[in-house]
């Protein structure tokens, strides 16, 4: 609903109604069209004793392929110019409890947000998602069974801030929406206390540091680097995301959180 006609507007797993009628040839044709070295990023982790020999192996693996250009433009994408609401039903097993079983996504499209604004929004979503935030506290008051998280989506034609709530009913959407508006304005006006800011920043910094202790560090790093490259076109995007963690206090001191919150996350947007 947020990005009609774009790649992001389609289910990543495919259109369920089309899958049963797909032929094996169609699957192979799709694989041939998109599973290609020119549409990939090769990442290497660990010590390489003989770089020349390693590069020779890569050359041997990739040499059978001709370089190929890929077009990821979205000519059918039509930007939304007013609020859009879409309700989707999903099947459940007979006897499944459906009370408070709705999942709600509220998306704010941040049209033309600069790289710096996206960096600020990324940290802002982490602050809003924290259990000590005004948003979480206010939501408990009006929808005690609901849980909420917030994240910055960069896969679409425009960056977007997405609020995801579970443990609610379809009829609670307006209550959720009003809670988000009020909480964002409260945050914009009051910011967050230094103690909470320090605690959240320290927790995320520790979480990032502990990644180096994981046994599958190389695999996880490669996946993160590749994902950030695919969504931004910048092979250093993941590094920049990690470095941005140092800016929690800086953005608050400079009033950046309030600035982007009022610009992109209010009822008028």
Q: Where are the language model's segments positioned?
A:
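Active/ligand-binding-proximal structured segments within catalytic/core domains
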Residues: 115-128
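Short, surface-exposed beta-strand/loop micro-motifs that present aromatic residues
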Residues: 29-33, 86-95
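A generic structural signal for well-ordered coil/turn residues at beta-strand boundaries
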Residues: 84, 100-102, 120-122, 159
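Charge-rich, well-structured scaffold segments of protease-associated domains
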Residues: 1-75, 101-104, 110-114, 132, ...
